[in-house]
């Protein structure tokens, strides 16, 4: 909490009354104009504590009417009632008078935004614009002059827009232009002087006149009226970011104008503000959107320009304001977020703006403002102004001026004594051990306080006063002068600070010891005492601790430099030590003076620093190492992420327990969280809200380090954390909070005045326990914190207090140890809780079971969070209902537990009904869809309301209910009307029959067809012996058995048949028996038995009565589910009547497969695939053995073969397991694709060979794939002899068709290889074939060689050819014509035509039937004949078909061999 110290200005000796006050915008100088009855008018300048600035007194015999400081320089413009304007230069103590064009009161003085020009205006409407130099002297004549003829009231300069070049440059910088960015950064660039920033003088402004008009003066000096109001203008504002002008008149008429760049104004809003008129109003604008008005009323009135909303803030008596106290003036400080207002009773009221945090919506309206403690002054406050960069507040009353400066409230807690400052010179002292409280009044403005059980010390930086308790009062035990900023006490010693040393003094100020600090260590400025240890921190971020247990203080921890322990350290903010002196906690500020979000805890014994990072929720340890090695760092999480994002502001160690540490942390301002926190996933619903202030306690141990013990939000009625001593936390209370009685149930205890305490979580109910119990509970808390529940249990097992066991049970909720919780509930005697916990064991989620424990212990918030965590929204719904949180229950049901939504609505409706809220109950009964019976019940005592509701709802069920009620009241006519609305035709018919109007009842039954109505009417007709009508309405009612009964009784046989067919099988059988017994119309009996599914009886009766048509119909409906004997009998019947297809179907249904197959053979019936499938017995069938099944399948396949259905035969042979027969059937089909596929999947040698043989019968010469398959199948079938024969045939094709002897030789080579590998039954025959192949290969090779050597040795080539011609078996291998053709071609090329002719003649003799042109080109033959002069031969040529060359057989073979080797 902050206090405001008031410093009354030291005015001149001459009595005077202040008239104007104004702060310099940046420097802490306040200008005050006052009126003196004797001397006239005065202007003085004061410092922040009210001291007058020397040589600044200005005095005239007339009054000052206007004051205005220069925006940056220490130049004050002063306007006087004579029209004189003085420029006072505070720096040089110079006065410069502006020339005198004004002749009356100066009404306005306003500096331009750059401070180079000044506008002055008087009450005659004369307006001047002056240019001044840096010392405040006027430069030449006025830049402009206007005479408006009416008194000027306000002047506001319009901020100049940035030049076009600057706008473009800004856009480029945002886009990432490095040059543009450098031009904006003056540290990196010298381009700044060249920026064309447009007209930066800002010499355009608005002025208002007494007649209510507003004029705009542009840069060129031209003036134009832009707005006009109906009365004098009281306030004028210009909102830069919206380019808008706000005008408020004396009649409180608010007008908002949008201003164009040219200065034209368009009115966009006009509204009449609330408040009394006829008196002066003080109006301020907050952040360009919120208008605040003080009009001498007890309230401040707010108007939100953006939302169009208004609200008020009132003064509250609990803060010390008087009833009827009114507010005269108001002012807002943006830096502090404080709204200050002065009252007619001399009080300064302040409202602090509540910050908006990023975890949700901020406060709105009057909830944005929190009223603070007022500052008490004197007189009627008329003016109030914030100013300077120090944010000082000047307050002017009718008699004096005071300057308020903020100072933090001092408070201290030590040895069960708490001292809290509540005003600048008043301290509230509470002796908590005895309950005594004292108000300590001093004659100084207190800047600090320190309390012990023996004395209380206060000081102000210049003087120290010691007070000790004496009976019911505090008496002064010593006062001495000492310029110390901080102070500490221990027993009878006082510790004060001076540069580079600590002074140990007596209560009277006598120095008895000096504790020195070196120049490098700095001067001590922070002190703390805990137990018998004192810790001191210096302004150079060093710290040292002392042991005070002896007569003189001894160093306990040598001086440490934080800069060596913590990187980027700024300065110390505060530091504390624990009761053992082995832990020192430190708060720091960063280098830029912003608060650090970490707490540093130095371990004296281990020489390590633990770092608590409250922003990220991490704890790290920095360990210093010897020999100047860099420190080591370790980090881990010390608290839940939901507790992250805070900044510590207070920290304390327990006064007696060295392990306990507590701190107070504020939520970081919006936008302050680092990225690491922002990346955390969103917290589960219900836990997303973050408290503004948290109290966190920790346990410290050597083995486990620092562990979070507890955390809770600081109660709203408390101001700040004051300290800690087991079993309580201590807080300062907010001023104005009324003292309240102790609330034992919530665990809060309030001490009168300013101190409050709250027990530690584990000590609720044990606040007055003895030391042994306290130690046991501390150990319990410690072990629970480290997670050792067994040790925690041992530490309290001997304690008999139920409160202790209840605390243990509460801990079990936190640790989720249900086994320990059972023991705790037993020791508490909590039978209900034990039973509930036992019943909850059936829940699968641990959190759900723990939540039940929390409910039994009254920990409802924890139970709620546990249910949310495990997402057991059904149990959460029940919890909300049981705890009377119905809105939450409904919300959960609607969003997450829709299974129980209607139940929730219903239960809520029952609750509302019990609460007598019938209107809401009715609504929720409707939502639960139970209103049709619950609302009539609920409104049964209010029939008029019920009737209105029923008529309004127009619901058939409700109409029916109301009709039944009316019928019970014998109001038949009205009941009929409502039954008709409800479309309850049964009730209509029933009432009409009751009234004897049976004809009307019959009309209704016929029109509607309602079964119940028809049945009731049929009963009526039957009772009246009107059989036909009864049968008719029984039929309409679908009550066929009753209609059949009447037909049988009354001989209505024709109707009986139709009714039986419409009725159930049982009724059909009864009707059939009726016809059978009667012996007539037996066809009807057979049909009815048939329709009823009684086939055996139908067949028997049909055979007996020779009804063949009926038999045929029955046979058509039989299937495999029918009786086999019945099927066989029907099949015989079909055979007799030559219905063979139906007979086969029946035989198959009866599973007589052989008979069905035999019938097909005998009658030459084609076996379809469907019939074949029906004849095929599954492998799992137990009706037939596997051998019989295969035999049947082969018979089916044989039959299919005879009928030419080869594919079906293949399928059945395959199913029978006879793949060879299946292949033969497939070969007969000629389906090459399926043959190849079947051979590939069968994997049998015989099938491979069969497939290959078949493929050889095809034109494999044109299809390389077929040739490849042939080679593959022969290879897989291990038929190498057949493969050799195929290669031999391939070679012959190459020779005969393509004359490709090279490929032919390759094919022969492959044939030889295959044959040589083959294992034949006749080796002699194999040897003969091999010899033949070898001979062929030799001849082909010789011919190939002869042709190849021709180019090198033609003679040798010709000789080889001639030798070949002499071979006896040449014709069987090589075409002789090819050899002769080769020789002829050679001799023709050599022009040896005679030799060529010779070989032609030999060829003719050797091949008499061949055409020569088949071997020798016809042109070659013609050339030979021409060369010899012979006639050309006949040119008749046989037709010759040329085929494409074959694939390389060797490559194909190698590819096939590879496939075979890879085939498993």
From Swiss-Prot:
It is linked to Defects in Ift140 are the cause of cauliflower (cauli) phenotype, a mouse model for human asphyxiating thoracic dystrophy (Jeune syndrome). Embryos die at 13.5 dpc and exhibit exencephaly, anophthalmia, severely disorganized ribs with extensive exostoses, vertebral and palatal defects, agenesis/hypoplasia of the craniofacial skeleton, and polydactyly of the hindlimbs. Cilia morphology in limb buds is severely disrupted with a broader and bulbous appearance. This is Intraflagellar transport protein 140 homolog. Component of the IFT complex A (IFT-A). IFT-A complex is divided into a core subcomplex composed of IFT122:IFT140:WDR19 which is associated with TULP3 and a peripheral subcomplex composed of IFT43:WDR35:TTC21B. Interacts (via C-terminal region) with IFT122 (via C-terminal region). Interacts with TTC25. Interacts with TTC21A. The keyword Cell membrane does not apply. TPR repeats lie at residues 772-808, 863-896, 902-935, 956-989, 1011-1044, 1079-1112, 1124-1157, 1190-1223. Its main location: cytoplasm. GO terms for cellular component: axoneme; centriole; centrosome; ciliary basal body; cilium; cone photoreceptor outer segment; intraciliary transport particle A; mitochondrion. GO terms for biological process: cilium assembly; determination of left/right symmetry; embryonic brain development; embryonic camera-type eye development; embryonic cranial skeleton morphogenesis; embryonic digit morphogenesis; heart development; intraciliary retrograde transport. PANTHER family: IFT140/172-RELATED, INTRAFLAGELLAR TRANSPORT PROTEIN 140 HOMOLOG. SUPFAM superfamilies: NHL repeat, TPR-like, WD40 repeat-like. Keywords: Cell projection, Cilium, Cilium biogenesis/degradation, Cytoplasm, Cytoskeleton, Disease variant, Phosphoprotein, Repeat, TPR repeat, WD repeat. It holds the Pfam family TPR_IF140_C. Component of the IFT complex A (IFT-A), a complex required for retrograde ciliary transport and entry into cilia of G protein-coupled receptors (GPCRs). Plays a pivotal role in proper development and function of ciliated cells through its role in ciliogenesis and/or cilium maintenance. Required for the development and maintenance of the outer segments of rod and cone photoreceptor cells. Plays a role in maintenance and the delivery of opsin to the outer segment of photoreceptor cells.
